[in-house]
Amino acid sequence: MGKNWKWLAKLFAFFGVCVGLFGIGTFSQVNGIASAINGFFDPDNAHCVKILPFLGEYSWSVVIASLILTVCVAAVLIGGVKRIASVSQIVVPFMAILYFAFAIILIICNITEIPAAIKVIVTAAFTPKAVTGGSMFVAMQKGVARGIFSNEAGLGSAPIAAAAAQTKEPVRQGLVSMTGTFIDTIVICTLTGLSIVLTGAWQVEGLEGVEVTTYAFQQGLPFPPAVSSFVLMLCLVFFAFTTILGWDYYSERCLEYLSGGNLKHVKVYRWIYIFAVFIGPYMTVSAVWTIADIFNGLMALPNMIALFALSGVVVRETKAFFKKQS
């Protein structure tokens, strides 16, 4: 695109730092972890404590979760304790398989309800009320927002990691990166969505975020509710923890670009990032999602401009790659 477009790269990098610090990287992840842990250990919020005068009361499980998470993240980012990150990366694939297995079991146990569930999904999306009332556009907006949160498609974050790969074929690396979007959205999100609709969890009032999935697993699986809740909590903790570390890497690279390679800024940023991890559990779910959606959109905008501008290059390189393979 040329040097005249450097401003777009800087804009992308700036919003990349914001997404890492306020969006996908910290607030939403630690808030989800704290919510899952609280749902398992203290679902009724029977044991609350007040940690600061200007804050409300929070369950002891939320407070302990925020402290442990902060210490673990600080140990990796500041203390260089890479073993924690290494263990998480080893365990996460097994957690993904376990989550997949539980979702499949739930669907099999409720297989007779699948036609009704699909009917609910389709009719809710295309009823005259949904179309004329504008709720269809709201659903589309929510779908795009949650899709970005799930697979980061169009966000521009995946190329930051892909750029570190040792490969002579950028197209091959792009194809590898695409599999993440397919697995996240087409497989995992479809299984989760079906689980929620099959068990009626989406209709239960007062449930937010991970609480909806927890309720679905508790109601739909042939295991004691405590077992289902514990497994889901464990999966979420490892998924979210590795995401926190991953987004620190993404946002650090963005900051490094903005600062011209000055690592002093990166060291300061790590402490700010750790503080964001600490305060995330004390935010409301609605605030967390709103902030994440805003910064996701802002980061995606310059990336989408670049994608459209470079689409010709992508097509040319892709054709050349497949021609070479044949």
Regions found by a protein language model. Give the residues of each.
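Extracellular/periplasmic helix-exit of transmembrane alpha-helices
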Residues: 102-120, 128-134, 164-167, 179, ...
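C-terminal membrane-solvent junction of multi-pass transporters and transport-like membrane proteins
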Residues: 2-7, 233-278, 311-326
